[in-house]
From Swiss-Prot:
Organism from which the protein derives: Arabidopsis thaliana (Mouse-ear cress)
Family note: Belongs to the PPR family. P subfamily.
Gene3D superfamilies, sorted: Tetratricopeptide repeat domain (1.25.40.10)
GO cellular component terms, A-Z: plastid membrane
Residues in PPR repeats: 98-133, 134-169, 170-204, 205-240, 241-275, 276-310
PROSITE patterns: PPR (PS51375)
Assigned keywords, A-Z: Repeat
Name of the protein in question: Pentatricopeptide repeat-containing protein At1g06270
Length: 343
């Protein structure tokens, strides 16, 4: 059953009731005292005081214990309170002022017995405020997500639970989940999220694919990365960002799979997306490394068709290797095409 929430759209006015609870909160320095003051602020709905209280600490605490008192609340009450806190921060300027509060709330929720979907709501508000969660969030979020997925729930079903507490899933929140899964080397699950998040109304973008592609390249999972690149340009209709194809080509070169790199470039161009100079350069160098000299010459010809000229050392090496194997005609054609472009 959906939980109805009353969102606070305006900053809360200052109330004298807060002074009754903590008459000298500016002098508070101990963690225990600040925690007690925050609890009082929640009881009196003086949520806008919470960032000041957290900042008053001598050290920037970013852990779950700052809001551990919320565990004593009933689930419905706890969700409502956290929602009210999040909504009260919307008009706060600078938007980064509640950063530590967001971080503490998110850590608390992710370590609770029922972390999702409330953690997604906090994460969404954090990202929309221009803040980034602390690095520990990647591990905690991945653990919480994988625990839910062990129950055989679909990606879309889990993400759509945000709607039950009054929040709409978005691509930015899903992208952070994808990057978290990549950060802990759960690449298969990250791919599933990218492929299925659209069923929850979150359309994958270049950030979604980019996170997975970067991680697959680092892991040299070339078969998977080529598949994802093809899905990105053919199914999603997304143009590769600068450097993306070069990174994939470099991974294929490292695995000595230069034919796959050429096939990938041809596929991307067949969908009318541009391939940058650096990608071609990596492929030519890879051809030379595996002694595919004729192939290197053909790739150089393809480069010149697009107005690209290989670096001088590379093109000289291509011509020399072609001459050495008796491919005089191709060597002369390559040299001529390069000269025409330079003139």
């Amino acid at each position: 059953m959906a939980i109805r929430l009353t969102h606070l759209r305006k900053p809360l006015a200052y109330s004298r009731s807060f002074d009754v609870c903590i008459p000298f909160f500016r002098s508070i320095s101990s963690f225990e005292a600040v925690e007690k003051a925050i609890k009082c602020a929640v009881e009196t709905k003086e949520y806008l005081r919470i960032p000041e209280l957290v900042v008053s600490l001598k050290e920037p605490y970013q852990n779950s214990t700052l809001f551990s008192f919320l565990s004593a609340f009933q689930r419905h009450h706890r969700i409502r309170v956290i929602d009210e806190i999040l909504q009260s921060f919307v008009p706060v300027r600078p938007r980064s002022l509640p950063k530590i509060v967001y971080s503490s709330l998110l850590t608390y929720c992710l370590q609770s017995s029922d972390p999702l979907p409330l953690s997604f709501a906090i994460l969404q508000r954090t990202l929309r405020s221009g803040c980034l969660p602390n690095p520990q969030t990647h591990l905690l979020l991945s653990d919480a997500w994988l625990e839910r997925r062990r129950g055989s729930q679909s990606v879309a079903d889990i993400i759509n639970e945000m709607k039950l507490i009054g929040y709409s899933p978005d691509t930015g929140t899903c992208n952070y989940l994808v990057s978290s899964l990549c950060a802990v080397d759960k690449l298969d699950e990250a791919i599933k999220v990218v492929e299925e998040m659209s069923a929850a109304g979150c359309i994958p973008d270049v950030e979604s694919y980019g996170a997975v592609i970067n991680s697959l390249c680092l892991a040299r999972k070339t078969t998977d990365v080529v598949k994802i690149v093809k899905e990105m340009v053919s199914k999603a209709g997304i143009s590769p960002r600068k450097g993306m194809l070069t990174k994939v080509a470099a991974a294929l070169r490292a695995n000595r799979e230069i034919w796959k790199a050429i096939e990938m470039i041809e596929f991307v161009e067949s969908r009318d997306y541009p391939v940058e100079f650096e990608s071609y350069e990596v492929v030519v160098e890879g051809c030379l490394e595996v002694r595919e000299y004729i192939l290197a010459g053909k790739v150089v010809m393809r480069m010149t068709d697009r107005g690209f000229i290989p670096y001088i050392k590379v093109r000289q090496k291509v011509v020399e290797r072609l001459i050495n194997i008796g491919e005089w005609k191709l060597a002369c054609t390559v040299r001529q095409r390069v000269s025409e472009l330079r003139s």
